[in-house]
Each structure stands twice: as structure tokens, then as C-alpha cells.
Amino acid sequence: MLLLLLRTLPLGDRILAVIDDTPTKRYGPQVEGADIHHNPTPGPADQKYLYGHIWVTLSLAVRHPCFGALALPLRAMLYVRRKTMAKIPKWRDWTFATKLVLAARLVEWIAPIVKQAGKTLWIVVDGGYVKAPFLKRTLRVGVTVIGRLRKDAALRDLPRKLRRGERRRGRPPKYGKHKISLAKRAAHREGWEVAQCTVYGQTVPKLYKTFLATYRPAGGVIRVVIVEEDHDWYPFFSTDPNATAVEIIESFADRATIEQDFHDVKEVWGAGQQQVRNIWTNLAVYHLNLWIHTLVELWSWSRPRGEICDRRQSPWDDTDRRPSHADRRKALQRQIMEHELSTLAAVQPLPRKILQLAQRLMDLAC
């Protein structure tokens, strides 16, 4: 799937991928790998927990020339709690791994493919994955990580540079001796800059300050960016010290595209609704949902808006709204049915009334 995207889409020299996890609800004690997990979207009922699977998912974040940022899911790994392992039959040959390890395996899978294509890889993660077990394995394969820092992250300044002719005993230090307080840096009035950033489909000014620091989980120097919003401030970082603040801000904003993926895979394709119990079968059907989602997006990439969706029959809708994934799927369904109808008409001519009736039915169905 990744090779198909690399060959088909007009991607630049830098590939941006997003990693995050999402739950799918399942029911029944015989569903292997399912357990009680934290619910990230409790909703009006305030349902703090749910029973089901947790999927650590890797998506390719791209920017469509007309429709903006979107993500193409590529691969996922199923997270099973350690206490749940006893319920899985031993002959399934399933081993325990944390979310951080699963995310690192996804990076180790995609990194050689991207490198072989002659491109660089940036990985965007949320704060839950900014930990040493993930960062160390990821940096080992030559990948740049963009993420969000904790506001109390244990940052230090850069190690002191030696003066000319000065020598130091032992190995050169990686980390500085002085701690850096993000809260104090954010509260200081000086050092702020303004830049135009394209985030969430809009180009807006962002107030930020940036500096270099050392961070032990990242194994050395990182680029830190503090962004000031209306009522709060947020710290981000890049393991590439040469990355600009605009690149970091825009890359992290594109992380939101995977959330739309999770919504579409569940609501449009019905991920989690397949009635299977075997843990490997669950893994297979989830990937089918991911890949059919990506193939539909790939099919509609170069098609104009009018071919994908027609909002004339919905005057209450916003005509400028970009086509949703459901619109793209309906457009593909419509094309398949029209092709089938034209094939039948070529074999045996059909009455005009039958063709008109079939066209009306397709309009209602799609």
C-alpha cells in the first residue's frame, strides 16, 4: 500500500506520518484481545470506559491541492493488556507489547521503505508517545519525531562550549547543567515572534518562541517551540534541531488528520462491527477497513469536486465544504453501478424507462 502511494501521489522529499491509538467497541467474552479501556470520547453519557480493542495506527499525512490536509491509514497493531494475555490461547502465538513498543515497530517498518524511495521521514505523535522507549528506537532508524511536550518536561540547556585551547577530561557531555522551566519561558514577555502558519485548513498568525534544549528521553538536543493561544500555551518539539518553528507547528497540526481517519473507518466502513473472535482475524478485518479507506481516497485524489459530490439537492448544506470520505465512497459506488449498467446495456439493449428508473435508484442509493 505504501509503495502504491509513493508511486501514485505527488509527494515531496519529506514524508509526514502520524501515529496514534484508537478504540473500537466489541462485545462478548469470547472476543480475543478485548478488554476494558479508557474511552477518549465519552460523549454526553460521560462513558469513561469501554470494552473493546485498542489499535495503534500509522497514517500518512498528505496535503491535497484543493481539499487540504488528510491522512491515509497504512498499518495498525493491536494493543492487548498484560492482564488480558491469559485469555488468549497459547497457540495463537501472540506476545505482549506496550503501545510505545508497537508504535516503534510501525516506525521501524515504514522507515526503510521511505529511505529506499529517497525521501526523509517525519513522525508526528501526541504527548503520550514522547517517552524514551519510543524515541530511542525511532531515532535509531534516522527518523525525525515531532510531538508535544509536557509542561513540566525535564529540559536542560546546552552543554557549555569549550574555549579555544581548553580541554575537558572524559567524554563530552550531552546535557547541560541548568534546568529549563517551560512555564517561566512561556511567562516571559520577551522573545516572542509571529509567523503565518497553515493549520486546520486556514492560514493564521501564530505567536511563538523557540529555542534549543537537551532532553534525556530524546538522547540529546531538540528544538522546542512554545505557542501562545488565547487562554493557554502549548510546548512542542522536534528531534531535528534544524527544523523551523513553522514546520513544527504545521506538522503537529496535521496530526489531527488521523482523528478524522478514525471517525471514517468506524462510521463509514464499520470498523469494530465485524463479528469475528479470533485475534488474528480481528487484526485482518481492521486492516481491510484501513486499506479500503486509503484506496477510496487514492481513487478520488485527482477527480474534481463536482464529480465526487453534488450538493444541489441539499440546499441547506455548505456548497464550499470539501467532500467527506463518505462522499468519496458514494461517488465510487455510483461509478461502479453505472459501469455495470452500461455493460448490461451493451450486451442487451434496455428500454429507456428501465435505464431512467435505474438512474433514479442509483441517485437515491448514492
Task: Annotate each language-model stretch with its function.
Residues M1-R7, W94-L121:
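Short, basic/hydrophobic alpha-helical segments
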Residues H64-I88, R92, I146-K151, L155-T257, ...:
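An anionic, glycine-rich sequence signature occurring as long contiguous blocks
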Residues P315-C366:
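Long, low-complexity C-terminal extensions of enzymes
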Residues R14, K115, F134-T144:
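Short, surface-exposed basic-aromatic patches at helix termini and helix-loop junctions that form
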Residues I19, P23, R185, A245-V276:
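Short amphipathic alpha-helical "interface-anchor" segments enriched in bulky aromatics
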Residues M1-I36, W109, R140, G165-E190, ...:
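Electropositive nucleic-acid engagement tracts
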Residues M1-V80, A195, K206-L207, F211-L212:
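Active-site-proximal, Lys/Arg-enriched surface segment
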Residues A271-Q333:
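Basic, amphipathic alpha-helical segments enriched in Lys/Arg and hydrophobic/aromatic residues
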